[in-house]
C-alpha cells in the first residue's frame, strides 16, 4: 500500500509569467486581436511614438472599425500623469488601454490599465527594455527621478511585436536593451542562484542562456539591422528578458545594477542616458562591489569580460561615458545614499554595502585587480576615495 501524502500548507504564490497573447505582426494588421479586447482603446503614448504609429492607427480605425483616441503619458510615468490619464479614461470610457512607445510609456499604460481594471495591449517602439512583456512598472517623479516600482496583477493581455516599427528606432536603443537584458544573469545569479525552487532555477538558467546569446550575436545584429540575427537579439532583449522576470517573479529580483540605475536618476544630468545604459554601468559597479568587499576573483573576471563586450557594442563603462564625469563629490554621495536606502535591492547582495563603499565602486569600474584591496583598505580607514 502506497504511503499517504500529508497535505502541506503553502503560501499562495501569484505568478504573472507572460502576456496572454504575443503576436509578431505589423501593428496595422493586428486589428482582429485588438477587437477581442473591445471596440475602443485609449492610446497611451508620447509625441514621437504617436508619429511613428500614426499611419498604423489610422489603418486600424479605417479597416477594423476601432476607435483609438490618443492620450499623452508625459511628462513621465509619474503620479500626476496617471491622475490625468484616469480622468481621461473616465471621459472616454474605453474598453482597453493601448500603450505604444518605450519603457516609460508602456509602464504608464500598464499601470493605468491596472488602476482602472481595463485590458491592456502593448506595442514597443524599440527593444530598449522588456516593459512590453512584464507585470511590473516603475514610477518616477515629474522630473524623471525614480520613486518606486509596482507589481501588477498580470502581464499585458496582448503584446504586439512590430519589427518594422522597432527597426526604425536608432541603434542606441537596441544597445541599451542589450545592457538591460544582460543584467538578468548578473543579478539573478546573485539573488537567486542558490534557490531550489523549480521556476526560479529555470529563470536563472534562462538568464545564463540569454547572456550567452547576447555575447555571441549582439555585434552582428547591430551591424545588420533587420537581419535574422538582429531579430534574434531583439527577441532576446524584448521577450526572453521578460520570460525570465515572469518565471522568477519575486524570487528572482534585481540587485545592484538596477539599484544603481535608480540612484543615478536622482541626478538631473543623468536623464539623457537611457535606462539600459545606466543599468549596464550598474552591472560593472555590482561586480566591483563583489571584488572590493569579498575579493571575488570570479567577479573580476566577469567584469573584464563585460568591459570587452561593452567596447564591442558601445555600452558605457564609466560615469564619464554616461556624461557624468563632472559631477561633484556631493552629487556622487547623493546618488550612493539613495541607492543604499533600506528598501533598496542593493541589499540583496550577500554582504553589507555602505554609501562609501558604493562610491568607491562607482569611480573604479576600470581599475585593475591589483588596486582593489588597497582601495578597499583606504575606504575602511576613511582616508578618502
Curated annotation (Swiss-Prot):
Coiled coil: none annotated. GO terms for molecular function: metal ion binding; oxidoreductase activity, acting on CH-OH group of donors. The keyword Zinc applies. The keyword Disulfide bond does not apply. CDD domains: GlyDH-like (cd08550). It is an enzyme of class 1 (oxidoreductase). Its cofactor is Zn(2+). Keywords: Metal-binding, Oxidoreductase, Zinc. Its EC number is 1.1.-.-. Binds 1 zinc ion per subunit. Pfam families: Fe-ADH (PF00465). Zn(2+) binds at residues 180, 258, 275. It comes from the Bacteria. PANTHER family: GLYCEROL DEHYDROGENASE, HYDROXYCARBOXYLATE DEHYDROGENASE A. Belongs to the iron-containing alcohol dehydrogenase family. This is Uncharacterized oxidoreductase slr1167. It comes from Synechocystis sp. (strain ATCC 27184 / PCC 6803 / Kazusa).
Amino acid at each position: 500500500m502506497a504511503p499517504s501524502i500529508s497535505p502541506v500548507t503553502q503560501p499562495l504564490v501569484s505568478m504573472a509569467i507572460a502576456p496572454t497573447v504575443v503576436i509578431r505582426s505589423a501593428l496595422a494588421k493586428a486589428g482582429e486581436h485588438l477587437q477581442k479586447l473591445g471596440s475602443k482603446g485609449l492610446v497611451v503614448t508620447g509625441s514621437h511614438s504617436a508619429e511613428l504609429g500614426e499611419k498604423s492607427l489610422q489603418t486600424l480605425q479605417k479597416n477594423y472599425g476601432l476607435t483609438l483616441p490618443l492620450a499623452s503619458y508625459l511628462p513621465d510615468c509619474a503620479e500626476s500623469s496617471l491622475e490625468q490619464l484616469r480622468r481621461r479614461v473616465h471621459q472616454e470610457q474605453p474598453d482597453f488601454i493601448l500603450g505604444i512607445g518605450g519603457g516609460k510609456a508602456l509602464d504608464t499604460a500598464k499601470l493605468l490599465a491596472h488602476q482602472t481594471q481595463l485590458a491592456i495591449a502593448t506595442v514597443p517602439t524599440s527593444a530598449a527594455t522588456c516593459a512590453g512583456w512584464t507585470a511590473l512598472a516603475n514610477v518616477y517623479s515629474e522630473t524623471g527621478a525614480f520613486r518606486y516600482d509596482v507589481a501588477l496583477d498580470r502581464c499585458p493581455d496582448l503584446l504586439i511585436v512590430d519589427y518594422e516599427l522597432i527597426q526604425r528606432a536608432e541603434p542606441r536603443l537596441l544597445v541599451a536593451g542589450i545592457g538591460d537584458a544582460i543584467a538578468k544573469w548578473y543579478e539573478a545569479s546573485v539573488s537567486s542562484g542558490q534557490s531550489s525552487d523549480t521556476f526560479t532555477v529555470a529563470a536563472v538558467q534562462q538568464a545564463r542562456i540569454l547572456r550567452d546569446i547576447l555575447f555571441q550575436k549582439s555585434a552582428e545584429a547591430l551591424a545588420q539591422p533587420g537581419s535574422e540575427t538582429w531579430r534574434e537579439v531583439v527577441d532576446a532583449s524584448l521577450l526572453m528578458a521578460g520570460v525570465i522576470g515572469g518565471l522568477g517573479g519575486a524570487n528572482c529580483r534585481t540587485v545592484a545594477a538596477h539599484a544603481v540605475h535608480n540612484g543615478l536618476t536622482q541626478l538631473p544630468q543623468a536623464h539623457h542616458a537611457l535606462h539600459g545604459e545606466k543599468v549596464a554601468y550598474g552591472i560593472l559597479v555590482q561586480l566591483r562591489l563583489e571584488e572590493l568587499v569579498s575579493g571575488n576573483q570570479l567577479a573580476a573576471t566577469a567584469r573584464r569580460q563585460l568591459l570587452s563586450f561593452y567596447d564591442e557594442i558601445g555600452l558605457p563603462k564609466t560615469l564619464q561615458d554616461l556624461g557624468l564625469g563632472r559631477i561633484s563629490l556631493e552629487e556622487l554621495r547623493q546618488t550612493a545614499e539613495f541607492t543604499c536606502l533600506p528598501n533598496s535591492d542593493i541589499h540583496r547582495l550577500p554582504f553589507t554595502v555602505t554609501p562609501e563603499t558604493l562610491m568607491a565602486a562607482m569611480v573604479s569600474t576600470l581599475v585593475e585587480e591589483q588596486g582593489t584591496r588597497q582601495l578597499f583598505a583606504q575606504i575602511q580607514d576613511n582616508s578618502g576615495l
